[in-house]
Amino acid sequence: MALTSDLGKQIKLKEVEGTLLQPATVDNWSQIQSFEAKPDDLLICTYPKAGTTWIQEIVDMIEQNGDVEKCQRAIIQHRHPFIEWARPPQPSGVEKAKAMPSPRILKTHLSTQLLPPSFWENNCKFLYVARNAKDCMVSYYHFQRMNHMLPDPGTWEEYFETFINGKVVWGSWFDHVKGWWEMKDRHQILFLFYEDIKRDPKHEIRKVMQFMGKKVDETVLDKIVQETSFEKMKENPMTNRSTVSKSILDQSISSFMRKGTVGDWKNHFTVAQNERFDEIYRRKMEGTSINFCMEL
């Protein structure tokens, strides 16, 4: 599948089991699939634009007992290896993870069916964050506009069709969320909602701490809540991707950390799109007990 970016270059996405992925990821697929997870690994799992960087910073702050300086040791993308990441000649996510001492905190956007089997076999812990599909779509649209490693999204109307048909990198939102939701009672999965973290960060961060087997006092917990707020992270060069070259992420088009709100979809969806989306959602998510908050 070749899609032209606004740079005029062809970005040819490749497919694995019906899911579109970046070409370098697919070229590295056998290495990714044979990745050796360890029983004490914690894997942060999200669909793209569902609060990945946010939960990474929360987890790291907990791991470092609220020590802000320790969390400044490296940019966020270097702290938690992204297992399916590949961009030769840079070390791949798998190589970075292999070089990391245990216990490891890793990251993925892969669906349950594409995840390296060793994660299931080793009974690892999984931390999944889900965000409502409409806000995910809006955020992903703006991310594709500014990310030169991904195909140009076209107009909002065109992207709406692309997204609902699952023809985006990492595949269908519906399949991704449904897959992880259905696995949550069979494995060590803490399933969180972006909207809940937004509504009551302290309550949700406490859940993450308990899941990680960590204890911090109330003062430290309050500090973690404060330091992982959208406003703080947007200004933090270790989380806001400001160190990434403009040739890769052009933040003059759209900020990497754009709004971080619940309900921004209402500024993008037409009435007709909203009605159509709701109908597709009902059909695709039929039989699942999952419920999303669409506005706060």
From Swiss-Prot:
Gene3D superfamilies membership: P-loop containing nucleotide triphosphate hydrolases
Localisation per UniProt entry: Cytoplasm; Lysosome; Mitochondrion
Family annotation (InterPro entries): P-loop_NTPase (IPR027417), Sulfotransferase_dom (IPR000863)
Chain positions recorded as 3'-phosphoadenylyl sulfate binding sites: 49-54, 131, 139, 194, 228-233, 256-260
UniProt xrefs under Pfam families: Sulfotransfer_1 (PF00685)
Catalytic activity: a phenol + 3'-phosphoadenylyl sulfate = an aryl sulfate + adenosine 3',5'-bisphosphate + H(+); cholesterol + 3'-phosphoadenylyl sulfate = cholesterol sulfate + adenosine 3',5'-bisphosphate + H(+)
Record keywords: Cytoplasm, Lysosome, Mitochondrion, Phosphoprotein, Transferase
The EC number(s) this enzyme carries: 2.8.2.1
GO cellular component: cytoplasm; cytosol; lysosome; mitochondrion
GO terms (BP aspect): amine metabolic process; sulfation
Expression (tissue specificity): Found in adult stomach, kidney and thyroid gland, and in fetal kidney and liver.
GO molecular function: aryl sulfotransferase activity; cholesterol sulfotransferase activity; sulfotransferase activity
Active-site residues per Swiss-Prot or TrEMBL entry: H109
Residues annotated to bind substrate: K107, T108, H109
Modified residues (Phosphoserine): S139, S254
Main localization category: cytoplasm
Function (record text): Sulfotransferase that utilizes 3'-phospho-5'-adenylyl sulfate (PAPS) to catalyze the sulfate conjugation of phenolic compounds. Does not transfer sulfate to steroids, dopamine, acetaminophen, or alpha-naphthol. Except in mitochondria, where it can add sulfate to cholesterol producing cholesterol sulfate, which alters mitochondrial membrane organization, and impacts protein complex mobility increasing state-III respiration, thereby modulating mitochondrial respiration.
PANTHER family: SULFOTRANSFERASE SULT
Family membership: Belongs to the sulfotransferase 1 family.
Name of the protein this chain belongs to: Sulfotransferase 1C2
Protein encoded by which gene: SULT1C2
